[in-house]
Amino acid sequence: MPVAARTPITQRLEQQILLLDGAYGTLFQSLDLTEADCRGALLAEHVTDIKGNHDALCLTRPEVVADAHRRYLRAGADVVKTNSFSATRLGQSEYRLEDRVVELNAAAARIARA
């Protein structure tokens, strides 16, 4: 790779091993969020249950997702992933949220960058 094309993360990887964050689903499950917690005001009237759809938290409870990122960073992670493991049309169809996939992914990226 030409020197000019190197990104800061590539430069860091050449010098050290970077630690990635952990499992978001496991972390969210440990919070014992209720259905109402998961829905928030945005999806309060949604037609199907969404508890267990941790990606939806990016829209309904972004502060919970941001806190998860902060927890991993405090624990020593160098890199955090977006909370978008199943933020695909197929993954969200179970919850009837497939029409919000773009919004989910944009929110997940926004939260991870913050």
Predicted regions and their residues:
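Domain-level signal for soluble alpha/beta catalytic cores
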Residues: 1-114
